[in-house]
């Protein structure tokens, strides 16, 4: 039976004291669960590992240590025990580790989310799986569907290439699907094992990535209308919007070659964020009768200190607005597409926004692009 959306949930008081309908239908987040590998290390330990793997013997390690100190990261989780990274001789070995470890983490994340939502794997109608740190055919989602006992008719959408924007974009695509299939249950699964993509060279981009990125997985269960949300502390998804910025392909992504995935990360990313993000986000909110001051909760992908600072500047956010993102960056690093989902889980379970609070979930990724998701608790 279709569960109707409560219209009052999607009506907001304007800043002028009037009331108006922001949007007439939505979908609901039923649960989010993050899974992290058990191998957790201090940033200082990872500094020495990366120096050993990436720098020439006897090379000055001062720049690397400065990068790691300024990254805003205290600890990270790795897919493998730290001593095993020296033995990863080629892309084939790294990708095999991605498949083995990634599948186990995916099952842990999805099982946790389903349990929290009171559902089973057989209840899933749509499974969207995003990862940019490994490849497989059959895809990871196909293997997981069989392993967890999903129905034979489950719809599967494996996604590669979204990178850090994948958590926000994936949640947006669940929303789009559920608007047309309001009786269904849809799942987003993010699996990112960034440490397995580390190259054995001292290029600046490789060292920057080695200072920021960690490993982990996250799963989101979503349903049509407000089914499963009441009393659980999870928000409604009211609307989404993406922005693709022309002539920015060079800013972020991979160069793929014989050694695997070589990171591309340009110093111009914060400038693009400061130039475009504020106006684009304000236009998105205005479409739904809102302004930034109406937003009580900001859930931002923790891309790094410079990116978070640029987001705060672009949106003119008050001090503390991005505390959950900074906390996630410090605790686990940048988990690529899984990061913003971990922040969403933290906000919902630790911060517990009051009913009626508006939120914005946002992330940026290769393209260069941004994705906005409007939430209501």
Swiss-Prot record:
Its EC number is 2.3.1.233. It holds the Pfam family Chal_sti_synt_C. Pathway: Pigment biosynthesis; melanin biosynthesis. Transmembrane segments: none annotated. It catalyses: 5 malonyl-CoA + 5 H(+) = naphthalene-1,3,6,8-tetrol + 5 CO2 + 5 CoA + H2O. One of its GO terms (molecular function) is acyltransferase activity, transferring groups other than amino-acyl groups. GO terms for biological process: melanin biosynthetic process; polyketide biosynthetic process. It is an enzyme of class 2 (transferase). Keywords: Acyltransferase, Melanin biosynthesis, Transferase. The active site is at 164. Involved in the biosynthesis of melanin but also various secondary metabolites containing a naphthoquinone ring. Catalyzes the iterative condensation of five CoA-linked malonyl units to form a pentaketide intermediate. THNS subsequently catalyzes the dual intramolecular Claisen and aldol condensations of this linear intermediate to produce the fused ring of 1,3,6,8-tetrahydroxynaphthalene (THN). Belongs to the thiolase-like superfamily. Chalcone/stilbene synthases family. Homodimer. PANTHER family: 1,3,6,8-TETRAHYDROXYNAPHTHALENE SYNTHASE, HYDROXYMETHYLGLUTARYL-COA SYNTHASE. This is 1,3,6,8-tetrahydroxynaphthalene synthase. It comes from Streptomyces peucetius subsp. caesius.
